[in-house]
């Protein structure tokens, strides 16, 4: 019995280890066929995807062809209780009076054409001294605070501050012109 078991095992090992041609190919070639490069896998994947896309396009084209060639139903065969289609409603041509468009908030029917403003020519910018603005702001603050203190305190300093303010306003006006 042991001898018979050894014979069966040896035949099985021999058959498994020996490359027997299958359909005209050896077992090694069949094994190589299963081992594909990444580029081959990508190619097959892309090919399958394109075939699936083509089938989808044919299917959609077939559906669209059915939609476009569908028979148009006659509108005279409408049941008495059904609602009319939204595009068959009879709306009046004009909704308001004739002078409705004349009194718009925005004037859209102007006879005059739009006149373009002349473009400003770029000129030299005036260079100012860096501390000049700060000095002017300080003067303004002084005059404001002086007005408040003189108003609250009731001292007779209003005249001095008025003359100071008029002097600064004259300076500003002369610089602007």
UniProtKB/Swiss-Prot annotation:
Domain of life: Eukaryota
GO CC annotation terms, alphabetical: cytoplasm; extracellular region; nucleus
Keyword check for Transmembrane helix: no
Subcellular location: Secreted; Cytoplasm; Nucleus
Gene Ontology annotations of biological process type: adenylate cyclase-activating G protein-coupled receptor signaling pathway; bone mineralization; osteoblast development; regulation of chondrocyte differentiation
Composition bias type Basic residues, residue spans: 122-132
Motif Nuclear localization signal in this chain: 108-129
Signal peptide stretch: 1-24
Stretches the record annotates as Important for receptor binding: 57-68
Composition skew (Polar residues), residue ranges: 76-90
Disordered: annotated span: 74-149
The entry's keywords: Calcium, Cleavage on pair of basic residues, Cytoplasm, Hormone, Nucleus, Secreted, Signal
Recorded family membership: Belongs to the parathyroid hormone family.
Subunit annotation: PTHrP interacts with PTH1R (via N-terminal extracellular domain).
Name of the featured protein: Parathyroid hormone-related protein
Native species: Bos taurus (Bovine)
């Amino acid at each position: 019995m042991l001898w018979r078991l050894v014979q069966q095992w040896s035949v099985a090992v021999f058959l498994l280890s020996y490359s027997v041609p299958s359909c005209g190919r050896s077992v090694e070639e069949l094994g190589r066929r299963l081992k594909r490069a990444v580029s081959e896998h990508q190619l097959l994947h892309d090919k399958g995807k394109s075939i699936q896309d083509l089938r989808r396009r044919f299917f959609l084209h077939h559906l669209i062809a059915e939609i476009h060639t569908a028979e148009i139903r006659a509108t005279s065969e409408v049941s008495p209780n059904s609602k009319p289609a939204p595009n068959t409603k009879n709306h009046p041509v004009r909704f308001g009076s004739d002078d409705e468009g004349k009194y718009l908030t925005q004037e859209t029917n102007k006879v005059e054409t739009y006149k373009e403003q002349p473009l400003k020519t770029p000129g030299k910018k005036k260079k100012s001294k860096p501390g000049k603005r700060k000095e002017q702001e300080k003067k303004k603050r002084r005059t404001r605070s002086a007005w408040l203190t003189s108003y609250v305190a009731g001292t007779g300093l209003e005249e001095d501050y008025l003359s100071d303010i008029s002097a600064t306003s004259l300076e500003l006006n002369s610089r602007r012109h």
